[in-house]
Amino acid sequence: MSEIPTVVTPTKDYKRLQAKLDEIENTVENTNAEIIQRTGKKAGRDVGIAYGLAIGFIFVYVLGTVLPLFDLIK
């Protein structure tokens, strides 16, 4: 039977490479977090615009209905 080949790396090299990989992973995580945060801000802005328009239309409709009533009261 054939044996599974194994590789032995020096501990110092392994730790150095592991530290570099951790640094790269941290950078990637921060970049992804910033991208997701920007996407969230854009979505929040769009939802805010939609709510603003809806409330504005309701406000204009209510004022259009209520203001003529004040003319009748005079």
From Swiss-Prot:
Function description: Part of a complex that catalyzes the formation of methyl-coenzyme M and tetrahydromethanopterin from coenzyme M and methyl-tetrahydromethanopterin. This is an energy-conserving, sodium-ion translocating step.
Superkingdom: Archaea
Entry keyword set: Cell membrane, Membrane, Methanogenesis, Methyltransferase, One-carbon metabolism, Transferase, Translocase, Transmembrane, Transmembrane helix
Residue stretches spanning the membrane: 47-67
A Pfam match: MtrG
UniProt key word Membrane: yes
Record-given protein name: Tetrahydromethanopterin S-methyltransferase subunit G
EC number(s) recorded for this UniProt protein: 7.2.1.4
UniProt source species: Methanococcus maripaludis (strain DSM 14266 / JCM 13030 / NBRC 101832 / S2 / LL)
Location of the protein in the cell: Cell membrane
Broad class of enzyme this protein falls into: translocase
Reactions that this protein is recorded to catalyse: 5-methyl-5,6,7,8-tetrahydromethanopterin + coenzyme M + 2 Na(+)(in) = 5,6,7,8-tetrahydromethanopterin + methyl-coenzyme M + 2 Na(+)(out)
Main location as per UniProt: membrane
Keyword Transmembrane found: yes
Cellular component, GO annotation: plasma membrane
Topology term for the membrane: Single-pass membrane protein
Molecular function in Gene Ontology: tetrahydromethanopterin S-methyltransferase activity
